Amino acid sequence: MQGEAPRHELMTRFREAEAAVLVGSAGFWEGVDIAGDKLSLVIIDKLPFAPPDDPIFRARSQAMARSGQHAFRELALPQATLALKQGAGRLIRTETDRGLLVICDERLRTRSYGARILSSLPPFRRLESFEEALDFLAED
C-alpha cells in the first residue's frame, strides 16, 4: 500500500510477487511501467478533476472567468481527461498486454461530458457489468 514503503520498493515488490495487489493514489499514474501479465487490472475510483480549492487551479479559473472563458470546459475537463488517459495508460504498455480498466465514477454515464472523456480513451472494449468483467478476465 502506498505510504508503507518508498515507491521504488513497492514497485519492486509488486513486480516480483507471484500475485499481488498494489493500492496507490494518483501518484502512481505517472512513471509506472509494468508490462505483461503482472498488471491486469487498474481501478480508478473517481475522475481526476483538480480540487476546486487548489490555489493554482483557482487562480487560473478566476483569470479565465475574467476573460470570458469557461474554466470547467476549457481547463478542468481537459486536465482531468489527460490525467485519466495517463492512468488508463498504465494498464496497456505493449501490443500483447491485456487487462481490465474499471472506472467507478458514475459521472461518465450521468454527465454530458462523460461521453467526451470516454471517447478520448484508447479504443478499449467496453463492458457494462460485473459478469462481463469476470468473463473477460477468464479469457485466455
Where in this protein do the model-derived segments appear?
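ASCE RecA-like P-loop NTPase motor cores
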Residues: 1-140
